[in-house]
A protein has these predicted regions:
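Acidic, metal/ion-coordinating pockets
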Residues: 1-258
Length: 258
């Protein structure tokens, strides 16, 4: 079984890059599933029903989110209705949406969960105890499990990889928008990478126009951020797994749009 996981899609340039490059990745790698982080799909922050449907229509089997899941109030009801989109599972009970889902293709069932880190981000419950609960909930419902750990601190992400090793197919990090060079299959059979990276304009500062980011750093004023369009790339990982639900390989896919 082979899923592709696409890192944070940032704004319109990210959606256009996904639309341009995903068909070629499908043809080249023949994935069974495509999971996309849509945390920044709408104008660089959050997601809307329109942008979510655009990503789903491109062929995503599931969309994960993160700390900007509720940036746009219009999406609350949609998150309750659309089972293919997951927000952080460790958000408060009663929050719009769901923390995990199961998608099926060709008889294979993939459980997808989104968990938010505690360090420098808001989370109602420990991501580690929530990960235990997710694994328990998905046991028997899914043949494979992919966890998107949306977190800031690399130490917390690495710790989560070890915490889940041997219990899920893949634990992939998102949020920082910078792909890390540590993709590997852990000893217990879990594919891991600290951060997948982003799908968007690499000519800025983690998806924001560089002049906006520099103005904020240089003046400490409240500068309006706009998404960077220059040098768009798609960052993703391709995981392969056996019938036991554990990974055999993970490959980073860092693809320029031009």
């Amino acid at each position: 079984m082979k899923p592709i996981f696409v890192g944070d899609v940032v704004g319109g340039v990210g959606r256009r890059t996904l639309a341009s490059l995903l068909p070629g990745l499908r043809e080249r790698h023949e994935p069974d599933f495509v999971v996309v982080n849509g945390e920044n799909a709408a104008g660089g922050v959050g997601i809307t029903e329109k942008t979510a449907r655009e990503i789903l229509d491109l062929g995503a089997d599931a969309i994960t989110l993160g700390n900007h899941a509720y940036r746009h109030r219009e999406v609350y009801d949609f998150l309750d209705r659309e089972a293919r989109i997951v927000r952080p599972a460790n958000y408060p009970k009663g929050s719009p949406g769901r923390g995990h889902t199961v998608v099926e293709q060709g008889g294979a069932r993939l459980g997808v969960s989104n968990i938010a880190g505690m360090l420098f981000l808001e989370a109602a419950r420990s991501p580690f105890s929530e990960a235990d609960a997710v694994v328990g909930d998905l046991r028997g419902q899914a043949d494979y499990v992919l966890v998107d750990f949306h977190a800031e601190a690399t130490s917390e992400k690495v710790a989560m990889g070890w915490h889940l090793d041997g219990r899920v197919t893949a634990c992939v990090g998102t949020h920082t928008h910078v792909p890390t060079a540590d993709s590997r299959v852990l000893p217990g059979g879990t594919a891991y990478v600290t951060d997948v990276g982003m799908t968007g304009g690499r000519g800025g500062v983690i998806g924001v126009r560089r002049q906006d980011a520099l103005a904020r750093f240089l003046t400490l004023t409240n500068v309006r951020f706009e998404t960077a369009d220059e040098d768009p790339w798609l960052n993703a990982v391709l995981v392969e797994a056996g019938t036991d639900g554990l990974a055999t390989s993970i490959e980073q896919l860092l693809v320029p749009a031009d």
